[in-house]
């Protein structure tokens, strides 16, 4: 398991990144997501069913960043992409318009990556996504993020992700997304 040393002035705790039984800790993970992403209880209830369904997909894996007391500070999960999955069916036309729909084949999708705000900016997100993709067995990774200049998009760019399609509209999402892709392994900095 990877250890992230804490900055004594900003983060007195050490986070450990390792396998996460996301099905068993789904409520705790979604609490982190709700705080980090600003979603309400109704949306959390919808996402709970989605997460549990995703965990049944072949190759789905999850990692968590935990404090020494076992508290979940962040999590990531993903799976090998399947063109038949809802996400792929939504982004395919946007990727095709940019000549990038080939990225839907042979890619590992980062489905969710969230770090509690108290632990953001300290390497937990970078450690989670890098550890997950390091052992996915595929040559590239794709993800979607809200299409704005944000710490998340800056993190992804620093890891080698580039825009494959922008202004992607998901049903019921209030803001457009960008689909990003990167060759694996992700660079270390």
Where are these regions (language model features)?
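Conserved GNAT acetyl-CoA-binding A-motif
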Residues: 134-147
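Active-site rim helix/loop that mediates acceptor-substrate recognition in acyltransferases
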Residues: 39-69, 73, 77-83, 98-99
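Conserved acetyl-CoA-binding loop-helix of GNAT-fold acetyltransferases
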Residues: 110-117, 121-134, 154-158
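A short beta-loop-alpha structural element at the N-terminal edge
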Residues: 12-31, 39-42
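Acyl-donor-binding surface of acyltransferase catalytic domains
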Residues: 1-13, 80-86, 90-91
